Amino acid sequence: EEMIKQWIMENIPDFNTKIHTEEDMKIKVLLPYLRSLGYVDEELRFENGIDVQIGTKKTKVYSDIEVIINGKVEMVIDAKRPRKALAEKDLLQAVSYAKLIDTPQAMYGVVCNGIDCVVTDTYTGRRTVEIPTKPQLLRAIDKAKKPIMKEVDIREVESVLFTLHNSKELYKVIQDSKDV
C-alpha cells in the first residue's frame, strides 16, 4: 500500500465525502501529509507563477506547491482533484514546470490526486509512486549530478509547457462555454 493512501485512511477517514476539489486536495490532504514527511511550512510555497515565453507569445503557469530546500525549489507538486485520472500530459506538465522553476532545475515533479501519486526525477526521468520524505529528498539532492540545462533545452521545455498549458486553457474555455 502506498504511504499516502495509508496516511489518508488513518487521518482522513471521510476522504470520499470531504475531499472534492483540487483546493481540498492541496490544503486538507497534501499539506498535512507533507508535514508528516518532515517538511515544515517555511519550506513550502504556493501558487507561484512563472512566465513562459515562446517567441512573442507569453503565458503564466502556476505551481500548486513547491518545496524549497536551502533556498532552492527541489520539488514541485501539482494537486489534482480526487478521482481525476492522472494523464501523461499532467506528468509532463509537472516535470516541465520543475525543470524551468529554478537553476539548476528542481529534483522532482509530482502529480497527486490523493489516490495516486507519480513522482518523476527530472534528471533521470525515473518515476516512482511515493513522495519522498524530507531526509530522502536531502539524500537525493546530495547524490544528484546536476548539470545546468542548455539554452536550447530550456526553450524546448518552455515550448512543451506553453503548449500543454494553453491547450488546457483552451479546453477550459470550451468546457466553460458548454456549461452555459
Residue ranges and their predicted role:
Residues 1-108, 116-180:
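A short, conserved, highly charged catalytic patch centered on acidic carboxylates
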